[in-house]
Amino acid sequence: MKPVPQHWQRFTPTLVYRDARAMIDWLCAAFGFELRLLVEGDAGEVEHCELTYGEGMVMVSQEHIDATPRFGVPLRGPRSVAGINTQNIMVFVDDAIAHCEHARAAGATIVAEPEVHDYGDEYWADRSYGAVDPEGHMWWFSERVRGA
């Protein structure tokens, strides 16, 4: 395989939000992401955004509810489809308990408190928690506590 471009991962998820601009700020404040790139459309809407967390990245885009779907596929966030999630984002953090408390204080809905998930001696153990952001995307934050 060819190497990926600098500062990119081989897989990069894109999250769609009704109010992408507000969620960019919220994701940075609550979950610790950093804004790397923001591209605005003619009307000031978020066309493309790259948020990083360590070596990881997610892209953020604005919903276009009334517009003709780009590429023939409508893109909607969970709030626009009755809260349904078709994916979760998992992020490794240094301290899952501290990260959880920071996210909770910033308004994240914690759906699973930090807990160790042990997959056996031949595998690993992680301390993880689950959170939902204000527009309904599900996130998992994990800290490796044993194993590779």
Task: Please tell me what each predicted stretch does.
Residues 1-14, 24-25, 31-132, 142-148:
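Vicinal oxygen chelate
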Residues 16-19:
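Short, surface-exposed ligand-recognition loops at beta-strand->loop->(often short) alpha-helix junctions
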